[in-house]
């Protein structure tokens, strides 16, 4: 039995906020300790994770990404309600939220584990490095000036290539349906631990993606006279400089989702989702 449950909602989506209130009321009626907070309040979320046994999210995939970063390095399962549009990671419709929660509280469902990456940002000037978890993707890209940058890629300490491009994406299987897919990358089965390397609009045609085994270590080194950026999962963003390196490898940690659908659920509707262009602002 779950003794403490957290509810994380998209603060700018009124329907997500309303549903969070209803879920909290349901838990109150069952005598289950619970708390609620905005997905955009990472500094408040992380301390609340201690002793929390289940997280409910109301929002889109972006809400899940922010929630995952607040949970890590703990491994607390997520039961997600889709208040966005596409919802590659979400599980329940708003209409099924209460009944789905009741099923999970009764012991139904299975755990869908997703692989993560660990990223280490290594500044060229020997300043202190920074570490991040990556659930979807890490992107090294040009800044606001519309000029290509050079990104040198090493794989397992061996030089692979230098992209002269808008940037490069290193993606997990979970992130394979996102930016990497838009840049021409493949879609991987969700429980794959493989790593995808995809250039962004490369100059002179070196436009293929590479699927790497899970034990690979990928270094992206920036070489540019212009502004460049690093983005982790689309919401951790920072400027980077020429000579800076981003090193990525498989993490020992996992993100856990509770699923009520069959284990082959991913393929149902996948083609429709990939062809769709109906993203809501609340997916972000």
From Swiss-Prot:
It is found in: Cytoplasm. Transmembrane segments: none annotated. It catalyses: NAD(+) + ATP = ADP + NADP(+) + H(+). NAD(+) binds at residues 61-62, 66, 136-137, 147, 164, 166, 201. Its cofactor is a divalent metal cation. One of its GO terms (cellular component) is cytoplasm. Keywords: ATP-binding, Cytoplasm, Kinase, NAD, NADP, Nucleotide-binding, Transferase. The active site is at 61 (proton acceptor). GO terms for molecular function: ATP binding; metal ion binding; NAD binding; NAD+ kinase activity. Its EC number is 2.7.1.23. Belongs to the NAD kinase family. Involved in the regulation of the intracellular balance of NAD and NADP, and is a key enzyme in the biosynthesis of NADP. Catalyzes specifically the phosphorylation on 2'-hydroxyl of the adenosine moiety of NAD to yield NADP. This is NAD kinase.
């Amino acid at each position: 039995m779950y003794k403490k449950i957290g509810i994380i909602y998209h603060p700018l989506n009124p329907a997500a906020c309303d549903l969070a209130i209803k879920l909290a009321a349901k838990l109150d009626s069952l005598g289950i300790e619970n708390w609620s907070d905005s997905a955009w309040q990472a500094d408040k979320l992380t301390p609340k994770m201690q002793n929390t046994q289940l997280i409910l999210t109301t929002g889109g995939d972006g809400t899940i990404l922010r929630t995952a970063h607040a949970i890590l390095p703990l491994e607390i399962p997520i039961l997600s309600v889709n208040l966005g549009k596409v919802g590659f990671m979400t599980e329940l419709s708003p209409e099924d939220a209460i009944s789905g929660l009741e099923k999970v509280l009764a012991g139904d469902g299975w755990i869908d584990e997703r692989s993560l990456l660990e990223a280490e940002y290594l500044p060229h000037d020997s300043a202190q490095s920074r570490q991040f978890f990556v659930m979807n993707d890490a992107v090294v890209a040009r800044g606001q000036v519309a000029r290509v940058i050079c990104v040198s890629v090493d794989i397992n300490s061996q030089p692979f290539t230098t992209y002269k491009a808008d940037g490069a994406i290193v993606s997990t299987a979970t992130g394979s349906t996102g930016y990497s897919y838009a840049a021409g990358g493949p879609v991987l089965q969700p429980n794959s631990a493989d790593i995808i390397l995809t250039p962004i609009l490369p100059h002179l045609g070196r436009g293929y993606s590479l699927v790497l085994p899970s034990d690979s270590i990928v270094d992206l080194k920036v070489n540019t006279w212009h502004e460049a950026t690093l983005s982790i999962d689309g919401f951790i963003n920072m400027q980077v400089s020429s000579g800076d390196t981003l090193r990525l490898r498989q993490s020992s940690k996992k993100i856990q989702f509770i699923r009520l659908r069959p284990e082959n659920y991913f393929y149902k509707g996948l083609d429709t989702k990939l062809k769709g262009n109906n993203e809501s602002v609340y997916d972000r």
